[in-house]
Amino acid sequence: MMITRDQALQILYEFTKSENLRKHALAVEICVAAYARKFGEDETKWSVTALLHDFDYEMHPDAPDHPMKGEPILASRGIPEDIRRAILSHANYSGVPRESALEKTLFACDELAGFLTAVSLVKPGRSVHEVDAKSVRKKMKDKAFARSVSREDMVNGAADLGVDLDEHIAFCINAMQARAGELGLGGAPSQTTTT
């Protein structure tokens, strides 16, 4: 039985009350779903996986509990094993190696989506439309900025996915720009004029 996106959202909202965590799940979903379309994969399955990857984080914010203790909850809700495995694999300490394209994509998009959100929020218009790969790479060098986001995971995620880091950053920015309003990162696309 395949779960729908709406059912995944219901589970996410049941267990995740923080608006920021909900938006993080949505940002990761947006990036992962864009890759599903690019790779010709099952967009619903990939979206569901991304939406649920941190559903248990408020209950179990520390390693190794997250996502291990959430997995039985998802199993009891009928979430397919391949989705649960991908969710487990997004945690480096889980011992579950990332093998499938879904698993690699989820890992590659998780930290990056959070970082792109953080970069967007420090822009004057608080908008993802003001973000580009160059500004993201510059912020990656600032260890005090979004210090909880692993730069190593962002770099390794792109490498494991077989994608150039700058291309990966730009791809995810473009995906998030298309749905910026849902993320609270809409602002307005910047207008440039030449004189």
Residue map of PLM features:
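Predominant activation on well-ordered alpha-helical scaffold segments within soluble catalytic domains
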Residues: 9, 13, 26-29, 33, ...
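C-terminal binding/interaction regions
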Residues: 16, 116, 128, 134-192
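Residue-level detector of short coil/turn "hinge" positions at structural boundaries
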Residues: 19, 43, 80-81, 147, ...
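Non-catalytic terminal extensions that flank enzyme cores
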Residues: 5, 194-195
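Acidic/His-rich, divalent-metal-binding segments that scaffold phosphate/diphosphate chemistry
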Residues: 1-62
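Conserved active-site and cofactor/substrate-binding residues in soluble primary-metabolism enzymes
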Residues: 3, 7, 23-27, 65, ...
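Divalent metal-dependent catalytic cores for phosphoryl transfer on phosphate-bearing substrates
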Residues: 39-143, 155
